Amino acid sequence: MDRHDTMDFTNEPLSKKRRFLGDQGDSDHVAGGPSSSPQFSAPPSSPPRKKLLQDPNSEVQPRVSKDADHNDDDDDDDDDDDEERPRFFTDDGTLTPHATKICAPWLNDMPKPDPRKGYLLKDVDTPIATPRDVAPPVVESPQLAFDKDTFEAFVGEKVASDILHVISKNCGNNIERAVNMYLDGTWKKLHRAPPVRVNSHSPLVVGGQSPKKSSTSQARSRSHAQAQPQPQSNTPTKVLPSMPDARYVGAFGVEGWATRSGTGLLRHGDSVKIERQKIQPPTVARKGQTKPGTPQSIPRVSAAAAKRVDVIVRFNDASGRELGRLAKDTANWVSTLIDQNICRFEGICVYAPERLRTNETVFLQLKCYMLRSAFLGRTLQLADNRAAGFHEKDETTEEKDLRLRQVALVRLFQEINIVPSRGNAAAAKDARKDLLEAADSAEKKAMDKAKAGDHNTNGLASPPEEAEEGQELEQDQLDALYKKAQSFDFSTPEAEPANTFAMTLRPYQKQSLYWMLAKEKNQRTEDRETSMHPLWEEYVWPTKDHDDKDLPVVPDQPCFYVNPYSGDLSLDFPKQEQHCLGGILADEMGLGKTIQMLSLIHSHRSEVAIKAREAGPTSVNNLPRLPTVSGQKTTIDAPCTTLVVAPMSLLAQWQSEAENASKEGTFKTMMYYGAEKNVDLVTMCCEANAANAPDVIITSYGVVLSEFTQLATKNGDRLSSRGLFSLNFFRVILDEAHNIKNRQAKTSRACYEIAAEHRWVLTGTPIVNRLEDLFSLVRFLRVEPWNNFSFWRTFITVPFESKNFVRALDVVQTVLEPLVMRRTKDMKTPDGQFLVPLPPKHIEIVDIELSEPERAVYDYVFNRAKRTLFDNMQAGTVMKAFTSIFAQILRLRQSCCHPVLVRNQEILADEEEANMAADVAAGLADDMDLQTLIERFTATTDDASKTNNNFGAHVLRQIRDEAVNECPICAEEPMIDQAVTGCWHSACKKCLLDYIKHQTDRNEVPRCFQCREHINIRDIFEVIRHDDDLETSSTPGASPEPRISLQRVGANDSSAKIVALISHLRTLRQEHPKMKSLVISQFTSFLSLISSALTRHKISFLRLDGSMSQKARAAVLTEFQSTNKFCVLLLSLKAGGVGLNLTSAKRVYMMDPWWSFAVEAQAIDRVHRMGQEDEVRVYRFIVKQSVEMRMLRVQERKKFIATSLGMMSDEEKKMQRIEDIKELLSSD
């Protein structure tokens, strides 16, 4: 007899109805403890029961859904009326007369139960959207004793005596349990299974071995076992040797809706399969073919892909035919658990209409099983290092999966009503609420971005190299954050460096050394009690399922652990790791961060390094064996070596300072860059080679990234590379650590993976302009729990973006305070002295007046940019066209430096080629040595040109001998700034130029004032006497003669800034023949033009920019430091903004302004820093009545707004950006 043919939902035995409903009632029962009888309730978020219990003559209206799949074979049934079915309960929860009649034999003497309230989800603040406002009836049932006749009346057939004996023996004298055991066949297993008992008070030992456990975890296991009630029956418990493929964790009720129509498709008690269709992983569109072995970057989630997210979860019958789908609210998170191989689900129908219609509501109970794969670690992945836009906050696929995983786990535990077995349940509830709010915030941000499309709403900052995230901090907020970090206690004890350190530290440096030593030596004692990691939660595996049946147990695995912030699961106890043994040295630039770290390296060595140093060199016969790797160890210890990661331009400086700060023979440094990388670091730095291991390895961020990329292609096999990631260093130091401020960049990810006992970062700006800048440093330092981005986002980012600034900034200050040591140059000691007594620094603005040709070019670019702004303002598209307007403003700034920078380079090259050809034909050049010209003219033997050459030679000799000669135009004697025409006639430079202008103004072709030959401005040469070269003469006893040259008039006048610079440098060379200077510009093409001018004027110079190799940079810096002659260093703003020590220079020339003066100040501080002994003068070249003057005004106004108005809304910021653009393109 098929039980489905004899029973329906309304007149079925109470025990059969109860066993298919969820175990939601008792928290003790859900957590794993037994209950006297199983509890049940309606599915989640069901409305009042009376809506389900409709009039027998009424018809249930189906929902309308676009996604419904109709079964055409059953369409004929849809036209029939519903059968009238007897009601089992009234609206107030009491039994109907029909039910009373059926149950009279055993309910006459029973007390009437109270109505049961509808089921509501616990710990869920927002109601779940359900497809229908219906719910199955719910009622409490009294417990009945087992009786043979009553039992057979319930099951509807005679039962053999041996079966009755087994059931009565194992049902605990409970008729409900007896009926359930008979109907689901449990009695058969009990009849055959051998009795196996488990002692819940002590863990079982499988295979004769038991894993070692700490005293704390053993005590925890004992207390947990004692808290578990003993089973009420003698049902045997199955013992598993290890974690099975899937393990039961709980059950819960859900709603679904049918996608088929027909009779008998789904009935109460039927099992259904919960399935997902296979989804395709996102692909990255790339041009061309990807090379084999190239690691794939994590794809970013596009707006279109975000809209196509498939969360459909289907329930199918045993044959695989789809019957319906889960409600969307439930499917949202159930689909995530299935897709990410965290859980699998089994379904049982609780309620379905006898004749099912499309879109009709079905109630299911889902049993959830945690998969073993969910407890396995995740593999190493790369991040996308490309910038998708200005300050774009794209969410990577990995981060989206993490967010969905977090929400899914939290919702699952809420549904099955499982709570942590350790810790404060109320605190856990609040933390989950905050985590869901953070996830909702991230989801809302992603949706807003998808709606916004590609609209560019960026500020006036220059385009960054990497996509950044988070709201920008205003200046007053930054000041508030640094206030605590900079409240330095001058009473801090001092520490003396080791005797191998060759330098003398200042008092404030000795105090920081004491602080750093204290941070590194704060080791956790071995006997300290092991505590659980604060981000993890402990949960107890259930020992009974929703039917109150015993579940299989795994010895020594009574609990599992969940990190709701990272979505990780573990079967092992997550220990609280030792807190950060390092920190952030954030002293302002010029206070000697490098020297302080070197003193730490000398003063704190590992025990292995100390013993190796005391033992001295080891003989070959006594060399220890090289290490072998066993077990799960992935790196080899390098107990004697500190790794320093710095920008490429600072590698040589680190090596030089490390050698200078160490006594001879006490310190070994190694450069790990370029050709020097061809070494086996594992063999060189391992403990077996401690006596010969380098004390410091210096490498660049680029090398770290390169080896990290290779590591990813090898699936994270660290030891195979024998490089940086194969070692666990004693210490790692990141210099200029703001290079890793973007947590999503590959460089940042690579640095996070460096293994080291102690971790330090050096930066003058821990927070550049976003709170996420600090998070990246905290993650590198591995500061628990803040290095978890989900935790950071929950307690810092979301409150800040929700305008709860006080809470967010207070939390950040608590993070900063124990980690950061920061001093500034304007700090004073208690006796009123500056920390570092530096010589004065004077900054002077040099006003530059553009020449007429330059002004013409500038006005053309200015009018075009202004017209573009006006057109977009009229159309209301200023922010859309911001990139175009910004590019035109950039061209405007370049025109202030040199008109050539904004001209078409191909046309310019053609013009220069034509001019050079004309000069070759005439024997002329921009810069000609007078003596060479005389010798050339004298050596001419051609009779046709001999006369002219003799005259030219005669004129040149007069110039050389300074023969008295008056100007033929103004009669001034001697001539003022003597100039020579191409036909070798002389006059005052100003007179000659005015004479030519007078003729061109009258539209006449200029002619020579003496011989009437045609002349032009390119044929006018100025006589230059190089008096400043006298001191370079090396001939002893000879009277020095100045070098004389003829330079084409206007060759240097094409740029007013270059003319001013040359004038300053020539004057400086006359006054200080051995002084060194810096010339800084953000445009490397402008530096090339300056270098040409310096060459023409015989001014010695060197150049350093980002295009140079590390060896070339090191050579330039060494030469600049060692030369004792007048020298100029041409420096690009980016290359000179970090880390360099250029105290040998005394003058700084800033050729063009940057958007923020703080960037210029970084470059200036390369000169004005500790070690500078002379006064420093800075000259900022600013063109009058230009965009450069207005840039300075915008900077000042923005500082005022930041400090006086504080945080502005997004709309206010947008308006401010437009005002900034208007200001830049306004007319003075």
UniProtKB/Swiss-Prot annotation:
Residues 211-237 have a biased composition (Polar residues). Residues 445-454 have a biased composition (Basic and acidic residues). Residues 1060-1216 form the Helicase C-terminal domain. Residues 1-96, 194-242, 280-302, 445-474 are annotated as: Disordered. Its EC number is 3.6.4.-. It is found in: Cytoplasm; Nucleus. CDD domains: DEXDc_SHPRH-like, RING-HC_SpRad8-like, SF2_C_SNF. PROSITE patterns: HELICASE_ATP_BIND_1, HELICASE_CTER, ZF_RING_2. ATP binds at residues 587-594. A motif (DEAH box) lies at residues 735-738. The keyword Kinase does not apply. One of its GO terms (molecular function) is helicase activity. A zinc finger (RING-type) spans 967-1012. Residues 70-83, 465-474 have a biased composition (Acidic residues). Probable helicase, member of the UBC2/RAD6 epistasis group. Functions with DNA repair protein uvs-2/rad18 in error-free postreplication DNA repair. Involved in the maintenance of wild-type rates of instability of simple repetitive sequences such as poly(GT) repeats. Seems to be involved in maintaining a balance which acts in favor of error-prone non-homologous joining during DNA double-strand breaks repairs. This is DNA repair protein rad5.
